[in-house]
C-alpha cells in the first residue's frame, strides 16, 4: 500500500521512534465561520490536532487503548490478545485498577494503523532507554505501544501511597523494547526530567507523568511532624527514592485536560489571589 499525501503543507510528522510517528495538523482547516477565529488562535498557541501513525510489519505489532483506532490500511487484523477466561478476568482487574481499558486490542499484519486525533500532546518514549525494570506511568495516559512491550501492574510500595495520596493501589508499568505513545496534558518541552542516584524527589501533587519502575514511591508528610506540615502550609507529598528517572509536569496536574488548560485550576494558588467581586 502507498499513501500519497499523508504529509502535506498542513500535516507534518513531528517525531518518530522506530515505527511510531506523531502527525500534527498545523492548523484546523475544517472550520465554520463561527469557529474560524477560535481555531486560528488555538493553532497559534500550539493547541492542535495530533495523531499517532503506526507502521506494521512481521516484526512490529501494536497494542492500543480500546477505541483508539481511526483507520487501518493493508493486511492488518485486530486481535483481542486474550488467552482464555482467566486472562480476561486478569485484564479486567488490571483495567479497573489503573483506569485503563480492560482489554487492549493488538493489531498485527502488514500496513498502517492510524489512531483517533486528539488535542492532547503525544509523547513518544523508547521503553528500552528506561532500563531493565522499565517505566511506570500515571493512570489514564497510555495510548499505544509496540507489541514487544509488556504491560504489567506495579503495586505501590506501601498502603500509605494509595490511601493518603488518594490514588489507586496499582499503576501500569511498561517494560521491554519498542516505542510507547502517551497522552500528556502539556507539551513535552515543558516536562522536567529528573535523574536520581541514591537520592529522593518530593512532589506536591500528581505531577509525575512517568518514573522508573525500580524507584520506591510513597506518600509522606512534607515535614517530619504534623505541626511542621501545618506551619509550612504543605500537607502530603509524593516521594520517589532510589536510582532512576522521573518525568514531571511543573505547570499543570496530569489528571485532566480541563484542569491542565484552565489557569485558575492548574495553579491552585491563583484562586486565593483573585480579587473579590463587589
Regions found by a protein language model. Give the residues of each.
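Composition-driven recognition of glycine/serine/threonine/acidic- and proline-rich low-complexity segments
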Residues: 1-278
Amino acid at each position: 500500500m502507498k499513501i500519497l499525501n499523508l504529509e502535506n503543507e498542513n500535516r507534518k510528522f513531528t517525531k518518530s521512534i522506530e515505527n511510531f510517528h506523531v502527525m500534527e495538523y498545523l492548523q484546523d482547516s475544517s472550520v465554520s465561520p463561527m469557529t474560524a477565529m477560535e481555531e486560528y488562535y488555538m493553532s497559534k498557541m500550539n493547541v492542535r490536532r495530533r495523531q499517532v501513525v503506526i507502521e506494521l510489519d512481521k516484526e512490529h505489532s501494536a497494542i492500543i487503548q480500546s477505541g483508539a483506532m481511526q483507520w487501518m490500511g493493508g493486511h492488518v487484523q485486530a486481535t483481542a490478545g486474550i488467552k482464555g477466561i482467566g486472562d480476561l478476568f486478569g485484564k479486567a482487574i488490571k483495567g479497573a485498577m489503573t483506569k485503563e481499558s480492560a482489554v487492549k486490542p493488538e493489531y498485527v499484519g502488514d500496513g498502517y494503523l492510524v489512531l483517533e486525533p486528539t488535542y492532547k500532546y503525544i509523547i513518544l518514549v523508547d521503553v528500552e532507554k528506561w532500563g531493565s525494570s522499565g517505566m511506570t506511568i500515571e493512570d489514564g495516559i497510555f495510548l499505544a505501544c509496540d507489541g514487544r512491550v509488556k504491560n504489567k501492574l506495579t503495586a505501590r510500595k506501601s498502603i500509605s501511597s494509595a490511601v493518603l495520596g488518594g490514588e489507586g493501589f496499582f499503576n501500569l508499568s511498561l517494560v521491554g523494547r519498542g516505542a510507547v505513545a502517551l497522552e500528556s496534558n502539556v507539551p513535552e518541552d515543558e516536562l522536567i526530567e529528573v535523574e536520581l542516584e541514591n537520592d529522593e524527589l518530593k512532589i506536591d501533587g500528581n505531577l509525575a507523568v512517568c518514573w522508573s519502575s525500580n524507584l520506591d514511591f510513597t506518600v509522606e508528610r512534607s515535614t517530619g511532624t504534623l505541626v511542621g506540615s501545618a506551619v509550612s502550609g504543605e500537607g502530603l507529598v509524593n516521594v520517589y527514592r532510589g536510582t532512576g528517572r522521573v518525568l514531571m509536569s511543573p505547570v499543570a496536574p496530569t489528571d485532566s485536560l480541563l484542569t491542565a488548560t484552565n489557569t485558575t485550576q492548574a495553579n491552585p494558588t491563583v484562586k486565593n489571589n483573585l480579587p473579590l467581586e463587589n
